[in-house]
Swiss-Prot record:
Its cofactor is Zn(2+). This is 4-sulfomuconolactone hydrolase. Involved in the degradation of 4-sulfocatechol which is a central intermediate in the degradation of substituted sulfonated benzenes. Catalyzes the hydrolytical desulfonation of 4-sulfomuconolactone to yield maleylacetate. Transmembrane segments: none annotated. NCBIfam families: SlmHylase. Optimum pH is between 7 and 7.5. Approximately 30% of the maximal activities are still detected at pH 5 and pH 9. Monomer. The lineage of its organism: Bacteria, Pseudomonadati, Pseudomonadota, Alphaproteobacteria, Hyphomicrobiales. Its EC number is 3.1.1.92. Belongs to the metallo-dependent hydrolases superfamily. Sulfomuconolactone hydrolase family. It catalyses: 4-sulfomuconolactone + H2O = maleylacetate + sulfite + 2 H(+). It comes from Rhizobium radiobacter (Agrobacterium tumefaciens). It comes from the Bacteria.
Amino acid sequence: MLPADQAGIPPCQGPRARSAPISFAIPKGAWDTHLHVFGPTAVFPYAEKRPYTPPDSPLEDYLALMERLGIERGVCVHPNVHGIDNSVTIDAVERSDRRLLGIIKPHRVMTFTELRDLKTRGVRGVRFAFNPQHGSGALDTELFERMHGWCRELDWCINMHFAPDALEGLCDLIAGAETPIIIDHFGRVETAAGVNQLPFKILRDLATLDHVWIKLTGADRISHSGVPYDDVVPFAHALSEIAPDRLLWGSDWPHSGYFDPKRMPDDGDLLNLVARFAPDVALRHKILVDNPARLFGVI
């Protein structure tokens, strides 16, 4: 592990410089619906309160990854290390030559006028990240209700990232939403207890709802077996039987929060998982192309 900085905040690893070759034909118009941009911190400093300090992973590095993987469109999700200043994400979206859309972090002083302006600049939703890794294990329900109403007016989505033990308490809120809800990283349900564990049963129930979308992202974060993530495949198959038209794929680049370089996932390995998640080419096309294009109105 790298030494902590003067504030005692541990630095985490950056992404791999190279990626494994892709094992299947990437369809034209493929999307990566979950990526982050960090820095450069000389221009976009990190929030003082943060769980770790990642190295700069600027837009240019991600665009190079898109070229290597054959991805055409992406969704830049605002990272917690940048706090409530969404500038880094908005800048990336605006400089991406219309290849990226943005998901921002909401806060209590935001106004509807501000959000309406951000829609013209490529933003398409907000994200509530309240898992313990991000320093908070509770949802700000008052802010959620306010943003829910505004997102409904703007035709935006709400991304949610939480610990799996929060699923049961969130059921009514998610089920009652009137705007698309995207659950990140398989709901963070870890694979060790199998597909019959209660959190995954709850996730499957939520996946039956027409406004609930599931990101098949973060396989490296929920797997107990590690590369090639065999234990994640049954979870993806179970979800594809329920919601084939509301599954999304994302890289989660640059994979923040890893302190051991040996655990840093390979972006090629993660994309190759799609062929195992969806052996059927038509389903694969839905996950990579049709579903995100429909959700984000790019059809």
